[in-house]
Every structure is written in structure tokens, then in C-alpha cells.
């Protein structure tokens, strides 16, 4: 597709999030490579397979903003629990806290887990979303480090003796599930060569 003409987007991509820490990470990873704005939308909480959830949220968001959107879904999957909590990690964390996440694995020797991040890009209403998936393997440990960003204190990636929360941001962003998924998003944008139209009205 290298000879294909660049597709014009009506406006900059809207990254849908109300999470300041998540937005900070995405900005740090993407830099100026992709022009985007952020917006908090109240999208219904869905159930199902992670990629299906992410795609449906992208469809709904694209309809709401009437333009290109990028949505993110994050999973934390415990291998001993056959992938749970998975996409429902947010609610598990809210209800049980970091100690509760560890307690889920008390009866199991296997503390291994993987973090997964799915970005879905819909170029506009009615457009089929594209997905970009990043995974990082690790294990669940008692909480260490700052407790200001989700489950970062209890996830220690393989090959490191620090949890996500203990790592310098620059290191985490290179090896994290979010960093890997966003690297694929950046590759797609570079290859697709999208052009954002500027009609001067905003």
C-alpha cells in the first residue's frame, strides 16, 4: 500500500479517556508523532472478549465525536485463573484493592500474569475499527511503589526486579503493554500517512 494516496482525516484523532495518568503516559509515548486531543466520554461498560469490547467502544465513540477516535482497554490476566480478572480488572481493583488482587492467588503456586493493552482506532462513524495489541508478561507480587496508578504496584514484569510502580517512567513506557501497543499505533500512522484537514474554523 506504499503507493496509496494519503487519507485525509477531518480533524485530529480524539483519544477517549478521563484518566489523567493514562493520558500522561500516552502523551509521553506518542510525543508529537500523532496529533490528538483527549476527551472524556461516558461510554457504556461492556462485557465480552477484550478486542470485541474495544472495537465496540471505538464505534460508539466515533459516532459521538463524529470523527476519528482512539480508545484503549487494559486487561490484567492471571494465568492460574485462566485469564481473569482480564478486562474487569478495574472493578476487581476498586472492590478488593491491591491486597485483594494478591489474595485471589493465595491458593495457587502460579503467580504469573500478563498485562494486555488494546487500542482501537476508528477513523469515523461507520468505519470498522482497527486494533493494536500489546502484551507484557510478569507476575503478581505484594504491592510496592507509589499507589497512584491502578494496579502498577502489584505487577512485576519478567526480567525486572521492580514493579511497574517502582520503575522510572521512561523504562516502564519502553517495556509496558501500553508502550508496545502504542508502538504499533505509531507504525500504522507512519505507514498510512494520514493528513489532518485544517479548515481554519477551530
UniProtKB/Swiss-Prot annotation:
Pfam families: Ham1p_like. The keyword Metal-binding applies. Its cofactor is Mg(2+); Mn(2+). GO terms for biological process: deoxyribonucleoside triphosphate catabolic process; nucleotide metabolic process. Mg(2+) binds at residue 45. It catalyses: ITP + H2O = IMP + diphosphate + H(+); dITP + H2O = dIMP + diphosphate + H(+); XTP + H2O = XMP + diphosphate + H(+). Keywords: Cytoplasm, Hydrolase, Magnesium, Manganese, Metal-binding, Nucleotide metabolism, Nucleotide-binding. ITP binds at residues 17-22, 57, 73-74, 90, 149-152, 172, 177-178. One of its GO terms (molecular function) is nucleotide binding. CDD domains: HAM1. SUPFAM superfamilies: ITPase-like. The keyword NAD does not apply. Pyrophosphatase that hydrolyzes non-canonical purine nucleotides such as inosine triphosphate (ITP), deoxyinosine triphosphate (dITP) or xanthosine 5'-triphosphate (XTP) to their respective monophosphate derivatives. The enzyme does not distinguish between the deoxy- and ribose forms. Probably excludes non-canonical purines from RNA and DNA precursor pools, thus preventing their incorporation into RNA and DNA and avoiding chromosomal lesions. Belongs to the HAM1 NTPase family. This is Inosine triphosphate pyrophosphatase. It comes from Oryza sativa subsp. indica (Rice).
